[in-house]
Amino acid sequence: MQQLNPSEISEIIKKRIEKLDISSEAKTEGTIVSVSDGIVLIHGLADVMYGEMIEFEGGVYGLALNLERDSVGAVVLGDYKDLAEGQKVRVTGRILEVPVGEQLLGRVVDGLGNPIDGKGALETTLTEPVEKVAPGVIARKSVGQPMQTGYKSVDTMVPIGRGQRELVIGDRQTGKTALAIDAIINQKGTGIKCIYVAIGQKQSSIANVVRKLEEHGAMDHTIVVAAGAADPASMQFLAPYSGCTMGEYFRDRGEDALIIYDDLTKQAWAYRQISLLLRRPPGREAYPGDVFYLHSRLLERASRVNEEYVEKYTNGEVKGKTGSLTALPIIETQAGDVSAFVPTNVISITDGQIFLETSLFNAGIRPAMNAGISVSRVGGAAQTKIMKKLGGGIRLALAQYRELAAFAQFASDLDEATRKQLEHGQRVTELMKQKQFAPMTVAEMGLVLFAANEGFLDDVDAKKVVPFEAALLSYAKSEFGDLLAKINEAGDYNDEIAAGLKSCIEKFKSTQTW
């Protein structure tokens, strides 16, 4: 056995002592001063960051939102009934993060990314911060690819491009959610991943949306983030940011994603509630001063990023691909008042709006889109050739029809040209009607728009336009399938395609009388 002499032993001990890391990690502890309505006032947290996760006793977390000289105001993320005055609070040194990745597709999660669908734990280990800075101007690319919703009226008159923010605004019960759900269903087979964020809705409504998505095979490419009406205001405030982070995962890897916020009015209400409870000074309509920033920092994250950004983000793994995150925020108005605080804010942030009207909805025109004030500021550049060529006449026909219809109420005798224009407008209005859960392909839209533009509907009674359209599409699918496939593939419009569409409609009309 080898003998160690005392000098060697002391030398080893000295080396060990030199290597020993005695710098301990000091973390401050605070004490709860008061708890009320999900807001906790804490004394003694010196080194807390804004937006940092703080840990209460019992494994409950909170979010530091008010940093004052001698106290910290935090919002509890979850149940606060077990929190009491005098309990200890610790800082975590972490900003709030949520799970991201392909494994979330087909799942229903809460505002923090915890699964709530009873299908077990998430298989992803990747997490990313909830709050992120939007890509800068240099990292972006202009919108140039279409994002088809499957609705004739939307895709012709207010086209949406990948990376655009298009507001869907209207009173309650005007079909806002229906339009968004159909847009998700229409992305089946396109490779676009979808995120549906439900904010402040009834649990039964959220369950109904999930069931409809499952029935139409759309849950495979969709993540549902749910912060229901019964969830704390903190969850309703955070859910849109969590959903956006999940969507950015796909965008930053050169893929396309679509996110729907249903609806941001309720997020603004939740934030107003939190701000008032934190005793922040109220402004217009009792909203805090930064309610514009609340929505702008969220919606600016929806963008189309260029190849360099994607390549840099993925460390060269993905090359030559652009990524996009398209946002469809929904805003609920009160009695059609679009000049209220939150609607005007979001209108100014987004790249256009689809305005849904109660009067049109009740008149059976669904989707109930007002073509006059609905607009897409950047989507025109992303439209396919066939939609751009054939869709122009539709907006004009509808605008003229609305104007003449108002005038015709007072005039008893109308000249022939005016009467023809009115009848054409009436048929186009009927043609724009579309049932829910029945999205159309580009070729199908092109066919019916061609029929309207070329006067093939002029001898069809206005009341029979909808059945005429259904019969025409059925005939085209069986007899002219190759033509439709060709249009869907390229979206082009030339003399050959125009001749093919004309031949299809003429042959159809020769077999049936309308």
UniProtKB/Swiss-Prot annotation:
Entry keyword set: ATP synthesis, ATP-binding, Cell inner membrane, Cell membrane, CF(1), Hydrogen ion transport, Ion transport, Membrane, Nucleotide-binding, Translocase, Transport
Catalytic activity: ATP + H2O + 4 H(+)(in) = ADP + phosphate + 5 H(+)(out)
Residue numbers marked as site, Required for activity: 374
Keyword Membrane carried by entry: yes
A Pfam family annotated for this UniProt entry: ATP-synt_ab
Subcellular localization: Cell inner membrane
Binding-site positions, ATP: 170-177
InterPro entries membership: ATP_synth_asu-like_sf, ATP_synth_asu_C, ATP_synth_asu_C_sf, ATP_synth_F1_a_nt-bd_dom, ATP_synth_F1_asu, ATPase_F1/V1/A1_a/bsu_N, ATPase_F1/V1/A1_a/bsu_N_sf, ATPase_F1/V1/A1_a/bsu_nucl-bd
Physiological role: Produces ATP from ADP in the presence of a proton gradient across the membrane. The alpha chain is a regulatory subunit.
Family statement: Belongs to the ATPase alpha/beta chains family.
Oligomeric form and interacting partners: F-type ATPases have 2 components, CF(1) - the catalytic core - and CF(0) - the membrane proton channel. CF(1) has five subunits: alpha(3), beta(3), gamma(1), delta(1), epsilon(1). CF(0) has three main subunits: a(1), b(2) and c(9-12). The alpha and beta chains form an alternating ring which encloses part of the gamma chain. CF(1) is attached to CF(0) by a central stalk formed by the gamma and epsilon chains, while a peripheral stalk is formed by the delta and b chains.
Name recorded for this polypeptide: ATP synthase subunit alpha 2
Organism: Hahella chejuensis (strain KCTC 2396)
Lineage: Bacteria, Pseudomonadati, Pseudomonadota, Gammaproteobacteria, Oceanospirillales
Gene name of the record: atpA2
